[in-house]
From Swiss-Prot:
Belongs to the phenylalanyl-tRNA synthetase beta subunit family. Type 1 subfamily. It comes from Salinibacter ruber (strain DSM 13855 / M31). This is Phenylalanine--tRNA ligase beta subunit. Residues 39-158 form the tRNA-binding domain. CDD domains: PheRS_beta_core, tRNA_bind_bactPheRS.
Amino acid sequence: MDVSYNWLNEYVDHDWSPKELAERLTMAGLEVETVRPLGQSLDGVVVGKVTAVREHPNADRLVLCDVDLGDGAPSQIACGAPNVAAGQKVPVATVGTTLSRPDPDDPEALQELTVEARELRGEASNGMICAEDELGLSDDHAGIMVLDDDTPVGTPFPEYLDAHGMPSTDAVLDIELTPNRPDAASHLGVARDVSALADSELRTPTVDTPSPGGPVAEEITVDLRDEAGCPRYVALLVRGVDVTESPLWLRRRLTAIGLQPRNHVVDVTNFVLHECGQPLHAFDLDAIADDTIVVRRTDDETPFTTLDGEERDLPEDTLLICDAEAPVAVAGVMGGANSEVSADTTDVLIESAYFDPSTIRRTAKALDLQTDSSYRFERGVDRDGQVWAAARAAELIAKLGGGTVVPGLVDEHPSPPAEKTIALRPDRLTQVLGTEVPTDEGTRLLGAIGFDVEAGEDALHCTVPTWRPDVSIEEDLIEEVARLHGYDQIPEPERVPVPSRTPEQPPEETLERQARQLLKGLGYREIYTNSMLRTDRAERFNVPPAGSDRAPVVETKNPISEEMAALRPRLLPGALEVMQHNRNHGQEALRVFEFGRVFRRAAEPDDPIVPGYSEHPALLVALSGPHAPTGWDTEPRSADIFDLKGTVETLLDDLRVPALQVRPRDAGATDEAPPVTQHHIDVAAGDTPLGTVARVRDDVAADFDLDTPVFVAEFHWAALVDSATAEQHRDYEPVSRFPVVDRDLAVLVPADQPVGPLQRAIREAGAPLLRRVDVFDTYAGEGIDEDTKSVAFTLRFGADRTLTDEEVDARLDAIVERLAENHGARLRQQ
C-alpha cells in the first residue's frame, strides 16, 4: 500500500525524514518495503506575469509573450499553449533551470530538460512557461498552468506550492500490510500510529455528520435483503453537481499514490478511501430506477458490465447492489458501467457500506478482480466509519463542483455490534514483556491509537475501537503497547530463568511425538492436508473410523470456493490426493501418515464449545506400491494389508496399548454406504474400538489415478491415547533358567478362516505353559480338500521348572480340542 509522506503530514506533526519515518513504522509493525522520492526541487522556476501576447511572425502555432519575472525588463518567451493570455500569473522556468519528468517510453526513467536561451523561428526565447506535467505536478499537458492572480511576481515557485499545501517534492512509502491490520490501510490509519510514536496529536478532518432520516430518506429507498452480506448500508445525496476536473491539490494527492484522476466526483471517493480506509461508490442518481437501492444476491449466473468495460458472468450467490430493475454494482468490488458518473451527471448518490469480508473475498476471487475497495473490505473496514466517510465525500463533492448536500441520510444498520472491552493487567504486561512499562505510558499509547482506557483497581479497562477487529484478548493489547513502546526499548534479560524441572507435557503430545518418530523410522512420510474440501467429496468419504457414529457433513458458511465448502469427516481423501500427486511425479512406493482433526455434527446438541458440532484428533497411516526396492537378492512384491497390519501392531505395541485386539470384521459388516474401503480389520484395546485397517476400493483409488492397491489405517487418536495412558499392571517375568519345549502343529481350516482368531484360541487353551505362538506356513492345493487350507504353527512351552512330555501333550490336546470346537479345525495328518 502506497502512503504519501506529504499527505500523511497533514494529519500529524513529527520531525522525521521519509527514511526515518519508514524505520519507525517498520519497528512498530508496519513494514515499509521501499521509500520512493517524487517530484523535483524546481529551483529556478519563478512566478511570472504575462504582460503582453503577440503572434509569432514565422510560426502559426507559436506566440511571443512578454513576461515580467520581477527582475527588471520583461523577458520574451515563445509559447505554444492554447490558453496563454495577457494578465496571467504563470510558472516560468528561467534560463539554466533543469526540469525532469517520467519518460513516456519507460516510466521508471526520467527525461531531463535544461532551459536555454535560444531562437525559435528567428525570434529569441528566454525561458519556458510551464504546463503541469513539465513541472512534475500531474500528467496534464493541455495548456500552461495558470496561478492565482494575487501571487506576487518573482516568487520562487516552490514557495507558491508550499503556501498552497503542495510541496514540490514528496516521498511514497510502500507499506506491506499484514492481514491483521486493516486499520492501517489508509493515511489516517498510519497517521494514528505515527501520533503514538511521536507523541503528537492526530488531526482528523472535521466533518458535519448528519443524523439518519431527513429529506434524503424521503427521496432514497434502501432495501437491505442480505444483512449477513451487508450489515450496514449508508446513502447520502448531493444535487446540482457540476462534474468537473479536480483541483491540482487533489490530483497531486492521487497521482502520488499511483491513481489516475478522472473527475472531481470519482476523485473525491478515491481520496476519501485512501484518507480513512472506507471504500465509497458514487452513482448517477438518474441511472438508479425508482431512486431505490436493493442489496441482494444473484439467484443464478448473471451477465454484468463493470466500470472497466468488461462484461463478466457473475456466479450464483454474488452479492449485488441493484436498483428497482437491475444490478448497478458488484458489492464491495466494482461499480457498473450502467450507473457511472459522467460529465452529464447532476445528482450524485453516495454509497458507504460495510460488507462481510468473506463474501467480498469470495466474489473478488471468483471474478479474478482485485480493487482498492475489495482489498479493504476483504480485511475488514471500520464498522462505525460509514457515516463519517460519506459525509466527508459529500462535503468535498459539493465544495469542488457546486451542488447541495441533501440534509439527512439513509442508514440501514439492523444489528449494530456490541462494544468490546478488554482488561489489561499491568503485572501481566510486565510478565510478558520482561520489562516494566509505566501505566501512564501504556494508557497514552493505547489512547493515541483510539482505545478508550479507564483505570480500575487491578487493570486497565480498554474499550476497543471499531476499526480494530484484530484486537480481542489481553495479549493483543500487550502487543500494541510493545510495538508502540518499541521492541528495541525492551532490554535483553541478563539471565534467562530455567526451571529446575522440565514441565510435564500432556500425554497426547508425548505419544504423538513418539508415534511420529516410530512411523518415520518405518519409512513413512508425514503429510499435512487441507481440512476443507468439496461437499460431494466430503459426502463420499463421510464414514468415521470405528467407534464413531455416522453424522451429516459439516458445511462451511460463505466458503472461499466450492473446493473448500465442507470440513473433512476423515483424513482419507486428503491422503489420497497427496498419494496421487506423488504418483504423478514418479514416486512408486507410497508410505504416508498424518495427524489431523476431523469434523462432524456433535452427538449431543448442547455441545459446550460449538453447539451441534464437534471435532476430534485422528491418525491416518497409508501405503501403496512396492513393499521394498527391488534388489539382486530380493523378489519384487507389492505391499499388502498384512504389511500395514504389521505397522499398526508395531506402533500400538510401542505405545503400550493394553489388551490389543486386531481381528477381521465379519464379511458385509460395514457402516459405509456407499463403501470406500473393504477387507476391514478392526483394532481395539479390549472392548474399546480404536480404529480400522482396510483396503481402499479399487474404483475409489482409480478416481485418484492410483492403479496399485491402497491400504489405510485410521484411528480415533483420543481413544488410543486414553487406552495407552490407562493405569496398567505389569508383572515382571524373569528369563527362565529352564529349557523350553517347541512343538509344531498343523491344522486344516476353511479357506476363508483368518489366522488371528486361531492364534488367540491357541493362546487361551495353551495357558499357562504356552509362551509363544508363531505361524510358519500356510498351504492350499494338492492333497488338501477344496475350500480348505492348512495353517502350521510353532508353539513354545515353558515354566519355572523343567516340563515333562505329559504336561506339554496335555496342553496340545487342549489346543486341538479348542480349535475344533471354535473353528472346525482338524489336525493335518500329512
